[in-house]
From Swiss-Prot:
Pfam families: PTSIIB_sorb (PF03830). Its main location: cytoplasm. It comes from Lacticaseibacillus casei (Lactobacillus casei). It is found in: Cytoplasm. This is PTS system sorbose-specific EIIB component. PROSITE patterns: PTS_EIIB_TYPE_4. The modification Phosphohistidine is found at H14. Its EC number is 2.7.1.206. NCBIfam families: pts-sorbose. The active site is at H14 (pros-phosphohistidine intermediate). GO terms for cellular component: cytoplasm. One of its GO terms (molecular function) is kinase activity.
Length: 164
C-alpha cells in the first residue's frame, strides 16, 4: 500500500478534503481510520456519499486498517488516510504501518480542550499522542488548507501546554 497522505481532521470528508486534499493526495482510495465512525452506520453512509466522485472510501478501525495494509492484494493501492484524532494514528504506527508525515488539519474545540491555532484544539491525550508520534519519527505538519504555511505543532504545544 502506498500512503500518499495522512491527515487528522475530525470533520473527515468536507469541502477542503473533497476539493483540495483528495486531489493533492493523488490517491485511489480514502481510508477513514476511526473506531467511533466504524461503529456508526449512518455516519459511514453520509461520509461515503460526501466523497469526491470516483473516489473509493472505506471506514475501518485500527486493527482492520493494519490488516488491510498488510494484505498483498492492496500493495499498489494509493491511499489517503483520514483520522479523527492522533491517538489512533499512534496505534496505527505502533501496529507497523510506516507513516512518514501527518498533516493536522482540524480538531474542533470542545469542553476540556485548549485551542492552539485557529482550527486545532487539544486535550492532554492529544498532546501526548502528538509528542509520541514525533518520538516515533513521524513528521507533523499543521496546516488547515494546502496554501497555509506549514506550522510546527510541537512548538505550539510547548507554548500552550508547557514543555514535556
Amino acid at each position: 500500500m502506498i500512503i500518499t497522505l495522512a491527515r487528522v481532521d475530525d470533520r473527515l470528508i468536507h469541502g477542503q478534503v473533497t476539493t483540495v486534499w483528495s486531489k493533492e493526495s493523488n490517491a485511489d482510495r480514502i481510508i477513514i481510520v476511526s473506531s467511533e465512525v466504524y461503529k456508526d452506520d449512518i455516519r459511514k453512509t453520509l461520509l461515503k456519499q460526501a466523497a469526491p466522485p470516483g473516489m473509493k472510501v472505506n471506514i475501518v478501525d485500527v486493527p482492520k486498517a493494519i490488516a488491510v495494509y498488510n494484505n498483498p492484494k492492496y500493495q499498489n493501492e494509493k491511499v489517503f488516510y483520514l483520522f479523527t484524532n492522533p491517538r489512533e494514528v499512534v496505534d496505527l504506527v505502533k501496529g507497523g504501518i510506516p507513516l512518514e508525515k501527518l498533516n493536522i488539519g482540524g480538531m474542533q474545540f470542545k469542553q476540556g480542550k485548549t485551542q492552539i491555532s485557529k482550527a486545532v484544539s487539544l486535550d492532554a491525550d492529544d498532546v501526548a499522542a502528538f509528542r509520541e508520534l514525533h518520538q516515533l519519527g513521524v513528521k507533523l505538519d499543521l496546516r488547515v488548507v494546502k496554501t497555509d504555511p506549514s506550522s510546527d505543532i510541537l512548538a505550539k504545544i510547548d507554548e500552550v501546554f508547557g514543555k514535556e
